[in-house]
Amino acid sequence: MQKIIHVDMDCFYAAVEMRDFPELRGKPIAVGGRSDRRGVISTCNYEARQFGVRSAMASGYALKLCPDLILVPGRMQVYKEVSSQIRAVFERYTYLIEPLSLDEAYLDVTDSPHCKGSATLIAEAIRADILAETGLTASAGIAPVKFLAKIASDLNKPNGQYVIRPDMINEFVKTLPLIKIPGVGKVTAKKLADLGLHTCSDVQAYPPAQLIERFGKFGTVLIERSKGVDKRGISPNRERKSVGVETTLAKDIHTLEQCRAVMPQLIQELGARVSRSAKDRTIHKQVVKIKFEDFKQTTIEHRSDDISVNLFYQLLEQAMERQHERGIRLLGVSVGLASNSSTTDDSDVDSSQLDLGF
């Protein structure tokens, strides 16, 4: 049985700013771009969240919700330096570390000799070390599998931790809302709700074959997660190459206008996912994916260093030139993330030639 810890810093960027600039403490602040430049919130503190401000929200809208919101420009180099300090703390307890972003990581402490092998005590020690050395608080989730550890880290925020023991899993997942499962966004949650599926117990009672037929590979993943199963191990060298969102349509659509109507929700969800899991990574391309009624698919991509709504619509128009009167059953958008060592090109490619990792 694995012992997995998911460590998540509390309001990381905002917390660093409040640490370095004490005059910001106790006030609603957000790290993000200026509203007059169509900026987006990267993160905000808890004072701002009380007004409904959230990550991936347009700065202009955030200011409408919270007129006293203080917008702070990001200092990425500082955040990276603090992240290195946090990583050094992790390495005292285990070498099996899978970073998800600058402020978040999975740790496998199954064979760690520290704290008498107790994952709970190791998590407490890690959080105490981080606080002592950086002045920042962290929350943690402890569980036998990755996705439950990630969920658990949210249950006692800020500056807390939550343990899901092996004997707790069955009861814990019964009432777990599906929206809490990593990979289930608003679009997928709506489709599941339309089937009467709201919690893991609902999925457990649903015919597996129908779920797999409707959701493909993700249907299999959903069935496993609903039972508390997650076969993934820690990947120390893991580097996410892309972040994407796609939707299988309730019925085939045929026109560009119909496709354009689907795009806003996809783009909004993509922005949220990038903010959650890749906010410290550099975007190098945008991609639109279409799957047709004959199950053949195509992708169009173009170089971009940010999420441009207009570019997504331009790529959609180009992809639709390959429709040839076929119905459209799936639409997807994604961004490619640059590796520290790789180079990219901006040529259009067909999905048969490139796995975009949707």
Swiss-Prot record:
Q: NCBIfam families, alphabetically?
A: PRK02406.1 (NF002677)
Query: What's its top-level EC category?
Result: transferase
According to its UniProt record, where is this protein located?
Answer: Cytoplasm
Name of this protein: DNA polymerase IV
Q: Which residues bind Mg(2+)?
A: 8, 103
Subunit description:
Monomer.
Species this chain originates from: Shewanella pealeana (strain ATCC 700345 / ANG-SQ1)
Per its UniProt record, the required cofactor names are: Mg(2+)
Q: What does this protein do?
A: Poorly processive, error-prone DNA polymerase involved in untargeted mutagenesis. Copies undamaged DNA at stalled replication forks, which arise in vivo from mismatched or misaligned primer ends. These misaligned primers can be extended by PolIV. Exhibits no 3'-5' exonuclease (proofreading) activity. May be involved in translesional synthesis, in conjunction with the beta clamp from PolIII.
